[in-house]
Amino acid sequence: MRPNVWHFYFLLAAMIVAACFTAGPSAFSRPQQGLVDQLKEKLSKTGVFFRADAPRSLRNPGDVHLPIFVEIINGVEQEAHTTGSGVSNFVKRDPLKLQGVNIFVKPSGIRHQFTTEPLLLDTSQEFSFDARVGGQPLVIQDRFKKTLEVPREAVRSYLASHFLGGPFTSVDFWVSIRVVDWPEQDFYLRVKLNAPPLPQIPNWYRGDIHYHSGYTDNPAERGYPLDVTKQAAIQAGMDWLLLTDHSTDLSPDRYKEELDDVKKLRDGRLMLIRGEEVTLASGTDAAVITVHMVAAPSPDDPDKGFPELQNADNTVIITGDGSVSYPAMPLKDALARITAAGGFAYAAHPFDPISPVMRGGKWDLDVDFLAPGGKQLQAGLAGLEPWNRATMSTADDMRDPFCIRPHEDASACFQHDPSLDQYIRLEQGIKEGWQPLLQRGLAPRSDGTDAPLFKTFLAAGSDAHGDLNFEASMDVTDFLGKLSRGLNGYAEDNALGRISTVVYAPAGVGPRGENVLRALREGRTVGSNGPILIAGFDRNSNGSLDDPEDVGVGQEISCPLKSLPPLQLRWVSSEEFGPLQSIKLIVGTSTGELPPVEVPVPSAKALASEGLVPLDLRQILKEGSQNWIYIRLVASTRNSANDEFRCYTNPIWIKVTGE
């Protein structure tokens, strides 16, 4: 969840107006009454949202259309427990009258400017999409949602007839929503046409462990309908999505409705799995601190949900909006319910604090991650998601962050933002949380079992709420530091498909995502925003890591040092993400991690290893003790634009039993 304060502003404004209403007209002089009327008029437009969005990259050549999603929300939210949801009683909103939507397109870059002629999708000579019926605007009482299926051939034809120098691989769209008595609502999107497939390795499937659909629906955050989500995810190169809609926005009926929608959309092209993002009370201070957790269903029955012990028909965990009147469920109670259902969980953005307006905080290493006594990970907790949001840059202009139109202030467009840099946040999260947990998991066992005490896995998720082209946010931290961002919002270059968890599933994802869930539960995954690096021990020396006796990420191997087979590496990148610049091997012990070891990357194989590449670990591990250790790897690439991309593997645990 992205921290925000929209509902706080909404509630504050409503309280002011409510006080004015309570006082009555006679309590004000004429000038004062005029001010009240102005405030009432402004509030009448509060909660009206316009959105236009499209996939950042079109990677599926089988889809001949470019989907542009348009949404208008006239101040109505679905039933939820969010703070301020009852404020609408104070607000009178007139219906909106939609005339239509104009779409303009041009090649990307400042050399080209939009023409005055829209891209026409039908016989209309005025709108790309004409909403009028019999010449009358379409009346919107509460919500309007439509996906404009723009033929790719129409885009190519338009560009060829209006611009020289094609064909063009990157194009800019200007989407103008026209509503009576409102200024034109303009959105600017950048799209890669015919983008190449993402790097792939057989039996590994890309997905997102943290994505919000339209079932996340509150005054602060909303996702997109599942059919829109599915189409965009396929274009982005995803194989599966774990839907993690907020526990504050769900009800038993809505959770069942979401599952019904998921089932209808299962056709073998993209696997949708219904999960949940649960707001919980931290063990540090249940009255003050809330944290978030990604809840995943049982791999044995992905559609089961999380049945309540007293009422098995209620399969959704409903808890916590940050308000004192609706306290969050204790973290341990939620984990108990999830594990009782056969599910598991990941700590969501554990070290990115949630907005203090929502009483949000960070996960505590000792109280939240570890079970009482500090000897084990909390039951049901598989790991953590410190790689949350693929953000490198932010922009003040949340409708044109790419500076597509002529811009008066280029500083309002995407600029590198160290405070939100994904690698800085990820490495800090690894240092604060993952490393200490991995280290504690290497402590000696007291039961005589020859295995690590416990394992903790890493996952990556976009945390996108719709956000197909870029992410639009409102952040209380930026509000306190920069008023314009608090009032007008800002943009991040995060989007669906920009970051993924890649799961190992040799039997495929499964008819309901069973194998995706097993891989997530067992740490058979890597995190990536482009390249893929996998590692393992080929125990039968047949040149494959896909046999049952082979050992891969998330697993362990115990053998004498002299019998330890080479670690086999395999990687793949592409021109889009650039050749491998480095592979770092990191060894972790019960006293901490050793300095990274640079693994040589043959220049001829910088884009792809083209099979397994062996690495002898015996020299690296020769001084190790006969206790459990782990190894993990980080690969980095750099493309022609000097952008860096990475892949982080989960560990392999190793015990050397002798010389």
Can you name each region flagged by the protein language model?
Residues 1-11:
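Bacterial N-terminal signal peptides that target proteins for export
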Residues 16, 25-27:
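Cleavable N-terminal signal peptides
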Residues 319-333, 346, 351-353, 358-371, ...:
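A Trp-anchored, charged/polar loop motif used as the substrate-binding/catalytic surface
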Residues 385-446:
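Substrate-binding surface in catalytic domains of secreted glycosidases
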